[in-house]
Amino acid sequence: MKKMQKYYYILASQHFLMEEEPIAEVLKERTRNYHEQEKEIDFWLIKQPAFLEIPAMADIKKKCPQPAAAIISTNSQFITWLKLRLEYVITGEFSAPSDTIPNPLASLSTVS
């Protein structure tokens, strides 16, 4: 099994993250910046994140309008920055891979 890694996230409704806020622009700019610096990408936008389905996340899932979306990162400072920029989001963290979260980036969304 892979070594456990801590992941940080912001969580909001898909509508808020993907339509109301210009988050795609922020992520595109950050991706470009990472490529210029030859840094490995450490953030991902996930529609309907599967980690919300585990029992320990039930209360958090209830607080978030569905369908949800998350930006997950191994960089806590990036998530803190996003939280300050976006305001109306839920933040948290988890460790994976684990028995309950085998794939931290898994989505329940089917690609159409």
PLM regions: where:
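N-terminal chloroplast transit peptides
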Residues: M1-M4
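Solvent-exposed, low-complexity segments and loops of surface/extracellular structural proteins
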Residues: Y9-I10
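Short acidic, S/G/P-rich loop/turn micro-motifs used as interaction or catalytic elements
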Residues: S13-P22, A50-I54, Q77-I79, P102
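Eukaryotic intrinsically disordered and solvent-exposed regulatory patches
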Residues: K28-N33, A56-A58
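Eukaryote-biased feature marking scaffold/signaling PDZ-domain proteins and nuclear chromatin regulators
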Residues: E38-I41, Q66
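Polybasic, proline/glycine-rich intrinsically disordered low-complexity segments
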Residues: I54-S112
